[in-house]
A protein has these predicted regions:
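Short, glycine/charged-enriched hinge/interface segments at domain edges or termini
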Residues: 2-10, 14, 67-256, 399, ...
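Flexible glycine/proline-rich
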Residues: 33, 37-38, 46-47, 60, ...
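Structured loop/turn residues at beta-strand edges in well-structured enzyme cores
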Residues: 61, 101, 122, 271, ...
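Helix-rich terminal scaffold detector
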Residues: 1-3, 8-16, 201-335, 339-345, ...
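Short, low-complexity N-terminal leaders and the immediately following helix N-cap/first helix
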Residues: 1-78, 84, 107, 138, ...
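Conserved active-site and cofactor/substrate-binding residues in soluble primary-metabolism enzymes
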Residues: 11-18, 32-35, 39, 53, ...
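Structural signal for hydrophobic packing residues in well-ordered secondary-structure cores
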Residues: 24-31, 48, 114, 128, ...
Length: 441
């Protein structure tokens, strides 16, 4: 953390960049582990993966049809079809392949290896399917084919060499780079690893993020509200945001405004946490329980630990906390309790921390420059970086504010796909002025 003496911290106002810098300096990528492919989805590859064998590993058919020699069908037409002797079936997974000689053909299925002697595949639709009639529309089942898999087939069109043949290594040649270190493993990447024969892979695991909200007024959605109560929305929103960032999220039910209860809850969650996120209780009120419970975290018992609470030059999200707890010094980020404040704080500070734990180079949301689309000028407090909610039109290059600047406006946040950034030295923004926007949608 930044080297400010304890007596000065109470009056210090930190910038957004200073706070983020301290967080990222204390958060390090998780240690790599070897995982089975089904468990590796969403994880980050820590080593280059090369292809041990070509993909596909052999020449194979891309169509259901007949494997033929090019010369045998060179003059084929509807009026004068090439009549070939069918010597057998070649299905996917076949071994002991028949050799196709002059005047011969082999029935072949999609994905089946091209038999020796064959130079091309003619789709079944270019033939009579061995029925002696007109053009076929589908391959007959092996048991229903005339004379089993034998007999004759009439081919109505010529084929060029290698027609409808997928060449060995046409997808990825042996020795080529399949996936680079730093790749996030999604379904296509998992499929590629399986296709080249990898059963396990070395990755950084998805961070385990525990989210808990505080406040005796909070009620689980679905329950009946009592006097002075509100539904707990923050823990649901932040857990969803953590999953969206790539983490495994655990949402803990709202904790009452009791410091001992909060400390005990946090201690219980350490066993399954790579990062702890709290929301609420970080301001200057009489019931700001997070600040009460964690401000006095004992560095004597856990050297290097403790949570520091700060005032940031930003709106919304002025009160923030950051530090570590427990014997393993699990990072903890304490966010404000107002819904918009907590979500904006997550995007600015928690999401980059999660991405850093994953070892990813791209920690932040994409950003763009956009012209303000508004009916009137906007005001912003001097000396604070303001984050307004907005909708971004990439084609027009504009951003339109949604709702006001209030930190409780959940409905406006739900309609937004961007955060409009008003710099600290700007107090008035005119329609048409260019501003930076953080793309969150």
């Amino acid at each position: 953390m930044s080297s400010v003496s304890p007596e000065d911290r109470e009056n210090t106002v930190w910038t957004v960049d200073e706070h983020l810098e301290d967080i990222l300096a204390a958060v390090h990528p998780l240690d790599p582990i070897e995982l089975q492919l089904p468990d590796a989805q969403g994880c980050v590859l820590v080593e280059d993966v090369t292809v041990p064998v070509a993909l596909p590993p052999f020449d194979n058919s891309s169509m259901d049809g007949y494997a033929v020699r090019v010369a045998d069908v060179a003059g084929a037409s509807e009026e004068f079809p090439a009549v070939l002797t069918v010597i057998g079936d070649v299905a996917a997974g076949s071994d002991g392949l028949p050799e196709v000689g002059p005047g011969q053909a082999a029935r072949i299925m999609t994905g089946a290896p091209l038999p020796p002697g064959a130079e091309a595949v003619v789709p079944v639709e270019w033939t009579d399917g061995g029925t002696g009639g007109g053009a076929a529309t589908a391959m007959l089942p092996a048991g229903a084919a005339p004379e089993g898999a034998g007999g004759e087939v009439r081919v109505h069109r010529p084929a060029e060499a290698r027609a409808h043949v997928r060449a060995r290594g046409s997808d990825v040649p042996a020795g080529a780079l399949a996936l680079a270190a730093g790749t996030v493993l999604g379904p296509p990447q998992i499929g590629l690893l399986a296709a080249i024969g990898r059963g396990t892979v070395k990755v950084r695991p998805r961070p385990r993020v525990v989210v808990l909200s505080t406040g005796s007024e909070l009620v689980q959605p679905g329950a009946e509200l009592g006097p002075g109560q509100i539904y707990d929305s923050n823990s649901f929103a932040l857990a969803a945001a953590a999953r969206d960032a790539g983490a495994i999220a655990y949402r803990v039910g709202a904790v009452t405004d009791d410091a001992d209860t909060l400390r005990a809850t946090i201690e219980d969650q350490l066993v399954r946490a790579d990062l702890l996120v709290t929301t609420g209780g970080v301001s200057v009120g009489a019931y700001d329980v997070v600040k009460e419970a964690l401000s006095g975290a004992s560095d004597a018992d856990q050297p290097g630990g403790g949570v520091e609470f700060r005032r940031l030059a930003m709106q919304p999200g002025k009160p923030q906390g950051f530090g570590s707890v427990g014997p393993e010094h699990i990072p903890l980020l304490a966010l404000p309790g107002n819904p918009v404040s907590s979500y904006v704080s997550f995007e600015l500070f928690v999401r980059p921390a999660i991405r850093a734990l994953m070892g990813l180079p791209d920690l932040h949301r994409p950003r763009a420059r956009a012209a303000l689309s508004a009916d009137a000028p906007l005001s912003s407090p001097a000396g604070k970086r303001q984050f307004l909610r907005g909708t971004y039109d990439a084609q027009a290059g504009t951003v339109t504010p949604v709702g006001g600047a209030g930190s409780h406006l959940v409905a406006a946040l739900a309609r937004a796909d961007a955060l409009i950034v008003v710099p600290e030295d700007t107090t008035r923004v005119e329609p048409g002025d260019a501003l930076e926007v953080v793309l969150i949608g």
